């Protein structure tokens, strides 16, 4: 496997869940072994939003969030951001309609389809749409 598309639903579990869900841990191990993670530009905003929500709910401390953001910058340095927001917005609308997804989730599906890479996600709707779109799920 040359790489995979990393959905924020998986990556957030690396910072929020202890113990980490089995699937999220398995995906993290792929990443730590040097398998390339591909993320859309939207991923960075989803990650920071998930962390600030966890801070507001007292799941993480401010220090935890600050450390997680530094870790995310390291992840992002190894990730390949191959799309622009404008291009994503155009395509995601059609994909969202076709597969009854949010526009945000459609961006991940489109990226996986375009790059011909498996998709790592914990989102049920996205997991259900992937095979119908011809996208392999990372197991």
Pin down the residues of each PLM region.
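Aromatic "clamp/platform" in nucleotide-sugar-dependent glycosyltransferases that forms part
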Residues: 100
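Phosphate- and divalent-cation-binding pockets in alpha/beta enzyme and binding domains
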Residues: 23, 46, 91, 128-129
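Alpha-helix capping/helix-boundary segments
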Residues: 10, 43, 108, 125-126
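Acidic catalytic patch
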Residues: 42-44, 64-97
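Acidic, PIN/NYN-like endoribonuclease modules and their adjacent C-terminal/linker elements
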Residues: 1-3, 85, 109-139
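Short glycine/serine- and small hydrophobic-enriched flexible loop segments
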Residues: 49-56, 113
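Short, well-structured N-terminal submotif of metal-dependent ribonuclease cores
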Residues: 1-42, 54-67, 132-133
């Amino acid at each position: 496997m040359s790489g995979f598309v990393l959905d924020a639903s998986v990556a957030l579990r690396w910072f929020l869940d202890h113990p980490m869900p089995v699937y999220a841990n398995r995906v993290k191990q792929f990443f730590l072994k040097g398998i390339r993670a591909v993320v859309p530009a939207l991923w960075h905003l989803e990650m920071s939003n998930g962390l600030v929500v966890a801070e507001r709910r007292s799941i993480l401390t401010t220090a935890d969030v600050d450390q997680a953001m530094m870790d995310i910058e390291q992840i992002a340095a190894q990730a390949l951001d191959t799309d622009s927001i404008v291009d994503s917005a155009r395509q995601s609308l059609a994909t969202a309609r076709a597969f009854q997804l949010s526009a945000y989730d459609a961006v991940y599906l489109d990226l996986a389809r375009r790059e011909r890479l498996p998709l790592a996600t914990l989102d049920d709707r996205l997991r259900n749409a992937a095979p119908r779109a011809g996208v392999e799920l990372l197991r």
